[in-house]
Amino acid sequence: MEQSVSAEQIELKSSLPGSKKVYVEGSREGMKVPMREIELSDTNGVPNSPIRVYDTSGPYTDPEYKVELEKGIPTPRRNWIIERGDVEEYEGREIKPEDDGVKAASNHTPVFPQMDRKPLRAKKGANVTQMHYARKGIITSEMEYVAIREGVEPEFVRKEIAEGRAILPANINHPEAEPMIIGRNFHVKVNANIGNSAVSSSIAEEVEKMTWATRWGADTIMDLSTGKNIHTTREWIIRNAPVPVGTVPIYQALEKVQGIAENLTWEVYRDTLIEQAEQGVDYFTIHAGVLLRYIPLTAKRMTGIVSRGGSIMAQWCLYHHKENFLYTHFEEICEIMKQYDVSFSLGDGLRPGSIADANDEAQFAELETLGELTKIAWKHDVQVMIEGPGHVPMHLIKENMEKEIDICQGAPFYTLGPLTTDIAPGYDHITSAIGAAMIGWFGTAMLCYVTPKEHLGLPNKDDVREGVITYKIAAHAADLAKGHKTAQQRDDALSKARFEFRWRDQFNLSLDPERAMEFHDETLPAEGAKTAHFCSMCGPKFCSMKISHDIREYAKENNLETTEAIEKGMKEKAKEFKEAGSHLYQ
């Protein structure tokens, strides 16, 4: 088994080209909110102001930070948590070999060699969720941090959390995480799924995927590991993750019963929840809406039940002919969640896995139950978001958003795409980004990325990059459509740079500067091409923007308005044509 992960084992890159890490200070000492500042060149001697953008990359892009993965990243939130006075350290549960799928203790690797702190939990009778604080009228340090990142007032953040329209996923045992918010009145967020399988990947690879995904803009990470070393892989990811980490606890619980769904018990699952909460998982996908009576509704589907968690619980329900134990024990789950401030991501175990099954009775029956469970969670002041489909054609997407807002009382929606067609394996990052942009516009708060490997295999780091960038495009397009007050600043800056032929600024303002520069340099690699007033698409004679510049220059020289310049130029060209004999070809 693997002993540790070092910075030398994975590729860690500095900040993106033309950018630098900057920090905005909050009201309390030591609160530093990260931003990425993109420096811009002058336009004919007139300075262009730098553009600041949201940054998810954590300390890895700070040139003053020394990466030591075996120690984990800094824990700025720990003091905030302790100062509130409502938590206590305790010994925590014993880490067992079976947590990593190992039978003998002699084969078990130490989980995280330099972990020297005990887990935290709420003191007896206390509730430590951000929703609980918000409902008491308290603006926490986390809420202020989020307000600075989003460019809004802290009171607005508090109110959105208190009313359930947004969540701030921040387990008290994940102090490494930089606070962020998920809600339809904030920037649309992107989640990246990582995790090993029974046949592929290592701890080092998964840690690298995490740092890689956050570099390109992933707002949260889900560790969906189903292979060996589940506990240890998760520990290394969380200790080094600057963003919230989510999981599907039923996957690990299933490993503890040797992969036999019918052998699952509430006791095994409960133990797994506590194990992961003590590690610092920020949100759990829990498929508590897959009820026994809904399973027959999937019988006539084209693709049945495609959710792994949903199919596991359906199999358990049918084998025992009992109601889903996640549903029957939901109040007890809430009691665990509020001790650590773990947020619910209520799973859509009956989501459609094909266009043929979109918006069917099974899907919406489960959604009704998720609405019921949302009310129960809110009774405990536990934060909730709702997971959504799936495979949905464009004309049926809006109905999903409208039903979710109505049935789940406006809780944030978190969707996988949706994929808008089933005919493009290898390109499902595109088929799903179409749906993601639409549903983000309609109100979805977070989009779960899809990589080119969807339906085909486990994604590697290049697939992760492709998936994140594709979904950042969808999320930004949704922000523009919703009229988010700061969304268009970057578009306008890039458009201005494009019109002024500031090529390097164009590259640096893009979501993937390295790819933009690479494509440009394939045909025009010379340094002089970075200042040329054309690209290889049109060349120097047919560049529309160069022609526009020429028209403006002509108008300026002749003291004309642009429209007058065009008319005058047209008349002059017509005169030249007639004087040359009116021949089409000279």
Swiss-Prot record:
Binds 1 [4Fe-4S] cluster per subunit. The cluster is coordinated with 3 cysteines and an exchangeable S-adenosyl-L-methionine. Transmembrane segments: none annotated. One of its GO terms (cellular component) is cytosol. Substrate binds at N193, M222, Y251, H287, S307, R308, G309, D348, G349, L350, R351, E387, Y414. Residues 38-59, 92-114 are annotated as: Disordered. Residues 92-102 have a biased composition (Basic and acidic residues). Zn(2+) binds at H391, H455. This is Phosphomethylpyrimidine synthase. Belongs to the ThiC family. The keyword Coiled coil does not apply.
